[in-house]
Amino acid sequence: MRTVYRIFIIVISFSFFCSCNEPVVTKQEKEKADSLSIKLNSPELKALNAQLLSDPSNPDLYNKRSQLYIQYKQFEEAVGDAKRAIRLDSSVATYFITLADVYFAQNKTRQTKEVLERTAVKFPESTEALMKLSELYFIVKQYQQAIETINKALKINENIARAYYLKGSIYRESGDTSKAISSLETAVEQDNSFTDAYYDLGIIYAARKNPLAFDYFNNALRSNGTYMDASYAKAKLMQDMGKYDEAITEYQALLTKDKNYNQANYNIGAIYLDVKKDYTKAIEYFTKAIELNGEWPAAYFARGYSYAKLGDKEQASNDYKKCLSIDANFSEATIGLRELN
């Protein structure tokens, strides 16, 4: 009996020791693992695996699976498949581009650049390789190399809308807005549904408070009705041009489509505060902004200032203090508190 009891104690102790050393899996980690399991058991991946079992020397299948692995963020597997595709057939530019895509997805810009530069030399007629390389040059701010590479692509095909858009983006970042406008306009001539090009043209003209901006924002929304940034930019331009009632209407329409576009709440509040002097309405919209983002110091300050205008010193003081608890260097809130006292 004593022996049985001793064995029982040992088993209990061993079980306790094992359970104490088991790794703790958080809910987030479990959800991530479950999500990955679903992806890795997806019909697309299963179909490719089945095809590769019956045709293991097909480079195109490895390339497709590599692209799928990129989507699933399984980068080691993606690199392996891309390299297999290249080993099986090194005469296809797309396989090299897929390998570059894997490296780029991992933010490995040096390896991405090396692969794309080799690809551009090996396949000088590949506009896809040239465009990806020029985009990489743009990202790392090698603007001259980017322009030269874009021009090579345009010599092969002068109708690449993306090439003109990228040139416009480079000129815009370089401060040459005239050339930026010219390139962006060419982009929308080549592709009249190029939303980003319309939007960028709108932003350039909006900075000049030129009404032409409205046409470009409207075109962006025509090509993509869910482009909320274009709706916001349109409303902001109305506000900047003194069309306050129209701006409020546009902001409210934006919030109907996307209730979380919080800058719209703040801007409506600012119009009621600074222009219409309707402090109660201003508080209403600043409160909405705070409800969506409780760590926004400017919204607390603006609401506090509105309360101060209504003579509610206690609420004003609370908001100023909250503002400073988030950003101790928010000098306007410090001044506001001093003025209340």
State where each predicted segment sits.
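N-terminal leader/linker segments that initiate helical-solenoid repeat arrays
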Residues: 2, 20-83, 87-91, 341
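Position-specific recognition of the canonical hydrophobic site in helix A of tetratricopeptide repeat
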Residues: 70, 97, 104, 131, ...
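Structural marker of alpha-solenoid helical repeat scaffolds
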Residues: 54, 88, 122-123, 156, ...
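Sec-dependent bacterial lipoprotein signal peptides
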Residues: 1-18
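Helix-start (N-cap) detector for alpha-helical repeat units in TPR-like alpha-solenoids
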Residues: 59-60, 93-94, 127-128, 161-162, ...
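Structural signature of tandem alpha-helical TPR/SEL1-like repeats
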Residues: 38-47, 73-84, 106-118, 140-152, ...
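Terminal, low-structured helical/coil segments at or just beyond the last alpha-helical repeat
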Residues: 23-33, 301, 305-341
